[in-house]
């Protein structure tokens, strides 16, 4: 599915509220994201996650830290092929 081909990172959240806050913050920063239901293959978190590009990864997590957005886990992904590799977990802070 070409729609997801530009998105190679997926981040899950501790709540739907945090997912929506993250989407709004990243949209305001001009970062392209897609808020989607968490893929069944991952069965984690609140049920919502964001897809974004690896090219924006540093900025994404800087915004999360500055705005106290609580995320759960993040993955590299080929969303169109349903292939996910866990890269990290939120450690708090």
Regions found by a protein language model. Give the residues of each.
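Solvent-exposed alpha-helices and their adjacent loops that cap or buttress functional pockets
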Residues: 2-5, 42
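Short secondary-structure transition/capping segments
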Residues: 4, 46-48, 84-87
């Amino acid at each position: 599915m070409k729609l997801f081909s530009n998105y190679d990172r997926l981040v899950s959240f501790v709540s739907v509220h945090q997912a929506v806050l993250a989407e709004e913050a990243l949209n305001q920063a001009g970062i392209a994201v897609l808020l989607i239901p968490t893929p069944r293959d991952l069965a984690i978190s609140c049920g919502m996650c964001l897809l974004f590009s690896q090219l924006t990864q540093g900025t994404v997590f800087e915004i999360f830290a500055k705005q106290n957005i609580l995320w759960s886990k993040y993955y590299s992904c080929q969303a169109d092929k349903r292939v996910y590799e866990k890269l990290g977990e939120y450690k708090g802070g």
